[in-house]
C-alpha cells in the first residue's frame, strides 16, 4: 500500500476515517445522478434489519447468492449483515424490491485484512430472489481494458466532507486505471476514478462496479467491488476495487455447492 498502515487503510475502506480540514462540497457516488427506479436491480443493499439503513453494497450473482467485500462481513460499526435488500431503489424501508435473510457468509480463502487482497465474500440467502443476477466476468480478465468506462452503484455519501447517505440508488461513471494507479495494488485489485468529485464514498463499500456491455441491464458485467481508497473525490486519486475476475474460481466453487 502506498502510505497507510493497516488500521488507517481499514478506516478509509470503511468510510470512517477522519475527514480532512477542507470544506468543499463535492458530488460523489455519482458526480452523475439517480438510477432510474427499476434499473440495476441486481444491486444489493446489506442491512442489519429488514427495513433499516443499508451500510454496504453488493451484487446478486445467483438467485441465492450475493457477492460483496469481506470488509462488509465485519460489523462496520453497524452490526453483521443480516438482510439483503435486492432490487430496491431506496436506502431503507420496504417500498419496493425484496428483503431476504442472509443465512451464511464466506470470505475468500486468501483474504488479507491488512492490505485487502482478495476482498471478496459470498453471502447465501434463505430463499431465491425473483430478480435476475448480474453477469460475472471472464476469468482471463478480458472484460477490463485501460481507460474503459465503468459504472459504480451505491447509496453512499453524496458529498464530502460532512456528507449524508443517498436515499435513492446512485451511480457514477468512472474510468478504469490499469497502470499508474495512485496505490500499489495486487492482482486481485483494479483502480477506477481520479476525476475530481466522482468517486465511491462512505457507505459504498462492496458496491458493484460494472461494465455496460449492451443496451440493457441484462448485458451488464460485474468487474469490481468498491474496496478502499483515500477520502472521497480527490483529483487524480483513483479508488481501489476488488477485481472480480481474480476471485472467479473461488466464487464459482462457493455458489455451485
Curated annotation (Swiss-Prot):
It comes from Phytophthora sojae (Soybean stem and root rot agent). Glycans are attached at residues 107, 180, 213. Residues 29-256 form the Peptidase S1 domain. InterPro entries: Peptidase_S1, Peptidase_S1_PA, Peptidase_S1_PA_chymotrypsin, Peptidase_S1A, Trypsin_dom. One of its GO terms (molecular function) is serine-type endopeptidase activity. This is Glucanase inhibitor protein 1. Interacts with host endoglucanases EGaseA. GO terms for biological process: proteolysis.
Amino acid at each position: 500500500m502506498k502510505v497507510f498502515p493497516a488500521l488507517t487503510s481499514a478506516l478509509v475502506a470503511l468510510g470512517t476515517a477522519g475527514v480532512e480540514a477542507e470544506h468543499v462540497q463535492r458530488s460523489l457516488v455519482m458526480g452523475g445522478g439517480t438510477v432510474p427506479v427499476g434499473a440495476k436491480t441486481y444491486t444489493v443493499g446489506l442491512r442489519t434489519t429488514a427495513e433499516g439503513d443499508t451500510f454496504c453494497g453488493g451484487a446478486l450473482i445467483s438467485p441465492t447468492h450475493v457477492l460483496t467485500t469481506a470488509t462488509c462481513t465485519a460489523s462496520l460499526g453497524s452490526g453483521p449483515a443480516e438482510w439483503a435488500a435486492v432490487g430496491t431503489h431506496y436506502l431503507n424501508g420496504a417500498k419496493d424490491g425484496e428483503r431476504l435473510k442472509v443465512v451464511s457468509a464466506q470470505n475468500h480463502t486468501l483474504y488479507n485484512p491488512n492490505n485487502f487482497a482478495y476482498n471478496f465474500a459470498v453471502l447465501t440467502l434463505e430463499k431465491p430472489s425473483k430478480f435476475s443476477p448480474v453477469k460475472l466476468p471472464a476469468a482471463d480478465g478480458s472484460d477490463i481494458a485501460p481507460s474503459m468506462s465503468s459504472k459504480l452503484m451505491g447509496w453512499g455519501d453524496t458529498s464530502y466532507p460532512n456528507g449524508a447517505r443517498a436515499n435513492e440508488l446512485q451511480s457514477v461513471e468512472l474510468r478504469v486505471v490499469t497502470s499508474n494507479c495512485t496505490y500499489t495494488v495486487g492482482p486481485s485489485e483494479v483502480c477506477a476514478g481520479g476525476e475530481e468529485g466522482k468517486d465511491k464514498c462512505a457507505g459504498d463499500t462492496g458496491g458493484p462496479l460494472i461494465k455496460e456491455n449492451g443496451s440493457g441491464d441484462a448485458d451488464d458485467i460485474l468487474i469490481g467491488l468498491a474496496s478502499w481508497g483515500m477520502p472521497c473525490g480527490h483529483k487524480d486519486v483513483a479508488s481501489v476495487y476488488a477485481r472480480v475476475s481474480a476471485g472467479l474460481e473461488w466464487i464459482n466453487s462457493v455458489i455451485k455447492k
